[in-house]
């Protein structure tokens, strides 16, 4: 049923169980790059064929940030208002990126289920989802697939680039596909990794200067992800001597990432990172 997806075996089992007995609302969570939107849409088509409505954050009017707003939910409410004999799946991708008051509207449609209508929510930032919605949803934490499964995407690529892509993507199939097919994305990711290496080896003054270059939230979050991956890699290779130091740095990175994902000030959070990382 899910043969076209590169999935962790445990995750595949959970998703197949869901398809056999679907909950009215399900929340998929995972780190960026595994391909949540693709997974959710595939599940939707397995459940309802072509009767899948896909909703994702978009720019509305003069807004600078893509979000799901009240009009989007009103549109969904209109679709599901009437009773139906066939299945309909509503996919809400990146559901954490909403306008004020929208979570209350989402909660209302989940609390008032319509027969044969199913909701698939996705998020890379589950702490931003209200407990009231989580408690009314089946939650599946999608694990990264193993490296051997990801290698299927690397056929036909020269050995040097294959090694780079595997390291940069860190077992995230969607990221891996993007790096393979888009040279600009590959170059940007490589630069982010270079910055992460320089951050780790530099002193505090150097780190402060490096993070001052990041103005865009998305770029800052991507840098944080690279820094986390590289910190873990260095530890596994034996280059970091003390586990307590590793744990402290990874906890710091995780905290900064959470704050950035919940609209924490980019400059302030990166300054905190530069000063406290050691």
Predicted region positions:
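Walker B beta-strand of ABC/ABC-like P-loop ATPase nucleotide-binding domains
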Residues: 90-91, 121
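Charged, glycine-rich active-site and insertion segments that engage polyanionic ligands
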Residues: 1-34, 39-51, 55-58, 116, ...
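Short glycine-centered, acidic/aromatic-flanked micro-motifs in structured strand/loop junctions
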Residues: 30, 92-94
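Conserved alpha-helical scaffold flanking the Walker A/P-loop in AAA+ ATPase domains
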Residues: 13-18, 67-90, 97, 101-108
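Flexible beta-alpha connector loops of hexameric P-loop NTPases
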Residues: 62-69, 95, 139
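Short catalytic-loop micro-motif centered on adjacent basic/acidic residues
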Residues: 91-92, 141
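Conserved catalytic/switch belt of AAA+ P-loop NTPases
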Residues: 97, 101-121, 131
């Amino acid at each position: 049923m899910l043969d076209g997806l590169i999935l962790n075996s445990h995750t595949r089992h959970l998703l197949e169980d869901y398809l056999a007995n679907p909950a009215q609302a399900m929340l998929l969570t995972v780190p960026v790059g595994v391909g949540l939107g693709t997974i959710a849409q595939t599940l939707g088509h397995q459940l309802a064929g072509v009767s899948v409505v896909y909703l994702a954050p978009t720019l509305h009017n003069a807004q600078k940030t893509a979000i799901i707003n009240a009009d989007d939910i009103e549109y969904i409410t209109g679709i599901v208002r009437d009773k139906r004999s066939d299945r309909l799946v509503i996919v809400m991708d990146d559901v954490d990126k909403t306008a004020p008051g929208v979570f209350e509207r989402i909660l209302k449609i989940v609390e008032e289920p319509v027969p044969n209508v199913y909701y698939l929510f996705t998020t890379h930032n589950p702490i931003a989802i209200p407990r009231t919605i989580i408690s009314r949803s089946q939650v599946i934490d999608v694990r990264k697939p193993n490296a051997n499964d990801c290698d299927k995407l690397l056929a036909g690529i020269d050995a040097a680039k294959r090694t780079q892509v595997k390291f940069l993507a860190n077992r995230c199939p969607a990221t891996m596909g993007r790096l393979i097919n888009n040279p600009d994305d590959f170059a940007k990711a490589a630069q982010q990794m270079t910055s992460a290496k320089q951050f780790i080896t530099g002193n505090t003054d150097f780190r402060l200067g490096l993070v001052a270059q990041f103005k865009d939230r998305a770029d800052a979050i991507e840098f944080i992800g690279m820094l986390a991956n590289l910190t873990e890699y260095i530890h596994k290779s034996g280059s970091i001597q003390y586990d307590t130091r590793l744990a402290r740095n990874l906890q710091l990175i995780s905290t900064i990432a959470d704050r950035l994902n919940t609209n924490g000030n980019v400059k302030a959070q990166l300054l905190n990172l530069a000063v406290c990382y050691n």
